[in-house]
Design a protein with these regions (language model features):
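Non-membrane alpha-helical structural segments and their capping/turn regions in soluble enzymes
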Residues: 16-21, 91-94, 98, 131
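A short, acidic, amphipathic alpha-helical segment used as a generic capping/interface helix at domain edges
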Residues: 94-109
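Surface-exposed alpha-helical segments enriched in charged/polar residues
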Residues: 24, 28, 102-106, 139, ...
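A polyampholytic, Gly/Pro-enriched intrinsically disordered region
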Residues: 85-95, 167-174
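C-terminal domain-boundary segment and adjacent tail
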Residues: 31, 63-72, 110-111, 117-204
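Metal-dependent polysaccharide deacetylase catalytic core of the NodB/CE4 family, i.e.
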Residues: 1-52, 57-62, 68-86, 113-122
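Loop/helix-junction capping segments adjacent to catalytic residues or to phosphate/diphosphate-binding pockets
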Residues: 13, 50, 91, 127-128
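Generic C-terminus detector
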Residues: 207-209
């Protein structure tokens, strides 16, 4: 669940006080329903600027989705600017699904794993009469044992836990200071280790090439 603004305003050009009010009132309304903190956000009209980003931080928002399709599977460097892979009506969605599910090499200098992020609105399925399109997509990507089907919040929490890992100077051990387990694979191998919260583990040895 994510806030979307109290009145779905485009906040670009607004002063920070009005931005904070728009964000916090949306958070409060959702938290009364959900019964727990809501720290996610989706930009109304996909619009934001530096003032909006500062307002999100001041309002306790930890991640925010844009509408800028990347057609890539990169994990965001900044979670307040989380660009999705594509919209659910994107012409390339099935091509992207096949690429995501393939075992082919995916080159990226900024992400250690592939993340397929599809965004959209539920009302669009009725508006465009394309429920079948979405059902075909879900049928293609569902049920894969090597895919983690997660919420935005779960992904951000896990990635931040990975980024907080503390490695020894010789690169042989790793300490997990977070509250959730983290899984680390070796280079060019399917082996992995589990690093439990508050624990230190030995890293996998490099394989001979």
């Amino acid at each position: 669940m994510a806030a979307h603004g109290q009145y779905h305003k485009c906040m670009v050009g607004m002063d920070i006080a009005r931005c904070v009010e728009e964000i916090l009132e949306s958070r409060k309304a959702l938290e009364r329903i959900e019964g727990k903190p809501v720290t996610g956000f989706a930009y109304a009209f996909g619009a934001y600027d530096e003032v909006v980003l500062k307002a999100l931080e001041a309002s306790g928002i930890s991640y925010a989705r844009t509408i800028e399709a990347t057609h890539r599977f990169d994990i965001p460097q900044k979670f307040l600017i989380w660009n999705p892979t594509c919209h659910h009506d994107d012409d390339k969605i099935f091509e992207l699904a096949d690429e995501f599910l393939s075992d082919g090499f995916y080159f990226s200098l900024v992400t250690p794993a592939k993340l397929f992020y599809v965004w959209g609105h539920s009302y669009e399925f009725d508006q465009c009469d394309n429920w079948g399109h979405m059902e075909r997509f879900l049928g293609r990507v569902a049920g894969h044992e090597d895919v983690w089907y997660a919420t935005n919040g779960e992904i951000r929490e896990y990635v931040e836990a990975c980024r907080r890992l503390i490695y020894s100077a010789d690169g042989r051990t790793v300490y997990n200071p977070s509250a959730i387990p983290v899984y680390l694979g070796g280079t060019f191998t399917k082996e992995y280790i589990e690093v439990l919260p508050g624990k230190t583990e030995k890293l996998l040895k490099p394989i001979n090439m």
